[in-house]
Design a protein with these regions (language model features):
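Gly/serine-rich nucleotide phosphate-binding loop at the start of the catalytic core
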Residues: 1-66, 72
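Short, conserved catalytic/metal-binding motifs centered on acidic residues
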Residues: 31, 46, 67, 71, ...
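Short alpha-helical patches at protein termini and domain edges
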Residues: 33, 80-84, 190, 214
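Active-site-proximal, Lys/Arg-enriched surface segment
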Residues: 72-151
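Electropositive, glycine- and tryptophan-enriched low-complexity nucleic-acid-binding patches
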Residues: 133-190
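Short, structured patches in soluble enzyme cores that scaffold and shape functional sites
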Residues: 150, 158-161, 198, 218-222, ...
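Domain-level cores of phosphate- or acyl-group-handling catalytic modules
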Residues: 166-228
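An anionic, glycine-rich sequence signature occurring as long contiguous blocks
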Residues: 217-269
Length: 269
């Protein structure tokens, strides 16, 4: 973390907009990063509750222990763009060191993309919150982002944005297209194959991947789709190449098909 990625050095370079700085920025941000990596559930567990003293890894917090309010105050003032740049530089180092060439699938670097909800509340909100009606018809505020990741590394995330008036908030596909274009611009050819669930079987999204020189594997589960019906018909006629194998108690069949009989030009043109 220190010698290769230089994370501690970069944290020390973050802008500190606090007027009073009784505790150095590094002495707050670095422990927060470590505790997030260790998946502690609450800042209170670390910085407030007396019983948490024994839970703190030795030498993780040095000097004066910050109160949880001081932690929140500092984190709310840090520019997210600076954090994003540290993350992007870390991805650059991983690419340069050819880390992503380990654990490929047939030599292809595969990355998944999906939406994730980060926060929800009926009481607290900010200008960037999305909104919806919950089961009791109360307005619920939440944050949601699209995340692109390899099995162990997050390439990037894109927050979905609220819209004014009666328009619906941004959808996952809109954020996904923006994320793909951003990663392509920032990191070049960051992956070979993008894997996604059935939501992403969408012409504009697939076209975005094609424009960025990416292949895709998308789950197809709607039996009503013509593409599904066409593929099933070809399976029954033993078209294409077939491979069978077992995984635990499950028997899995993999088919490699091309030359579908329906006109797909409207789908991926």
């Amino acid at each position: 973390m220190k010698s290769v990625y230089k994370i501690p050095q970069k944290i020390k370079g973050l802008s500190d907009e606090r007027k009073r700085k009784p505790i150095p920025l590094f002495n707050i941000v670095m422990p927060v990063l470590i505790f997030l990596m260790l998946q502690y559930e609450s800042f209170h567990t670390i910085f407030s509750a007396p019983e948490s003293m024994e839970k703190r890894p030795k030498n993780c917090i040095r000097g004066k222990i910050p109160k949880v309010d001081a932690v929140r105050d500092l984190l709310s003032r840090i520019d997210p763009k600076e954090i994003e740049e540290i993350h992007a530089q870390t991805i650059d180092v991983l690419k340069r060191n050819r880390v992503f060439r380990e654990g490929t699938i047939g030599g292809y670097v595969a990355a998944g993309i999906d939406g994730v909800e980060l926060f929800s509340s009926t009481k607290k909100s900010c200008p960037d919150c999305l909104s919806r009606k919950n089961g009791t018809r109360k307005t619920e505020y939440f944050h949601r982002s699209v995340v692109g990741k390899s099995p162990h590394v997050i390439f990037g995330q894109e927050m979905l944005k609220p819209r004014d008036g009666s328009e619906k908030d941004e959808g996952e596909l809109t954020g996904a297209k923006r994320l793909i274009r951003h990663l392509k611009k920032r990191h070049g050819h960051f992956a070979d194959v993008i894997m996604a669930d059935a939501l992403y079987l969408n012409a504009p999204f697939i076209n975005t991947l094609k424009e960025c020189g990416l292949e895709t594997v998308i789950r197809l589960k709607d039996e009503r789709r013509l593409l599904f019906q066409d593929a099933e018909s070809m399976f029954q006629r033993d078209k294409g190449r077939k491979r069978s194998f077992r995984k635990g108690k499950k028997s899995i069949e993999v088919w490699d098909l091309s030359g579908f009989e329906i006109d797909l030009t409207w789908t991926i043109s």
